[in-house]
Amino acid sequence: MVLSSQLSVGMFISTKDGLYKVVSVSKVSGNKGDTFIKVSLQAAGSDVTVERNFKAGQEVKEAQFEPRNLEYLYLEEDKYLFLDLGNYDKIYIPKEIMKDNAMFLKAGVTVFALVHEGTVFSMELPHFLELMVAKTDFPGDSLSLSGGAKKALLETGVEVLVPPFVEIGDVIKVDTRTCEYIQRV
């Protein structure tokens, strides 16, 4: 438990209505001299934002997360199946949680996840992954437009710009944060 006056942006709190991320916090003085803490909250796993008022000094339940390493297995209908490397449980993660991270997934990739009461609320890919080039442009097709680079389609479906010497079948290192080529492996 934390006091309402200790709430800060980025914290997660648990209420009877669910789990929320604190988006903004401000102190408001009431008519009778009472001070309230006005908080904008974003429902975990969605874009829905609500506003709540807490009395100054009111206790609020801070959500506790368990860090977990999960290994990606495969896509099953509209959910991604992972293996928890700590206890070997299977965990399904919906597409809404995966967002843009899904385009880098291939079997065997280990991700870092934050879990609250058995539910994954966020996950992070390794900063760098090694992926195989499935298709590339011919060197002359895109060189003039991109300053010496050509387009390459990777095994997961991601398209990146690569140097002209990269060929189909090469394994390259990609920065998952920027979707940029780093080096040939």
UniProtKB/Swiss-Prot annotation:
Pathway assignment: Protein biosynthesis; polypeptide chain elongation
Origin: domain of life: Bacteria
Keywords: Cytoplasm, Elongation factor, Protein biosynthesis
InterPro entries linked: Elong-fact-P_C (IPR015365), NA-bd_OB-fold (IPR012340), Rib_uL2_dom2 (IPR014722), Transl_elong_fac_P/YeiP (IPR020599), Transl_elong_KOW-like (IPR013185), Transl_elong_P/YeiP_cen (IPR001059), Transl_elong_P/YeiP_CS (IPR013852), Transl_elongation_fac_P (IPR011768)
Signal peptide segment: none
Cell compartment(s), UniProt: Cytoplasm
Any Pfam family hit: EFP
Keyword Hydrolase: no
Keyword S-adenosyl-L-methionine among UniProt keywords: no
Main location: cytoplasm
Family stated for the protein in its record: Belongs to the elongation factor P family.
Function: Involved in peptide bond synthesis. Stimulates efficient translation and peptide-bond synthesis on native or reconstituted 70S ribosomes in vitro. Probably functions indirectly by altering the affinity of the ribosome for aminoacyl-tRNA, thus increasing their reactivity as acceptors for peptidyl transferase.
Name listed for the protein in its UniProt record: Elongation factor P 1
Gene name of this polypeptide: efp1
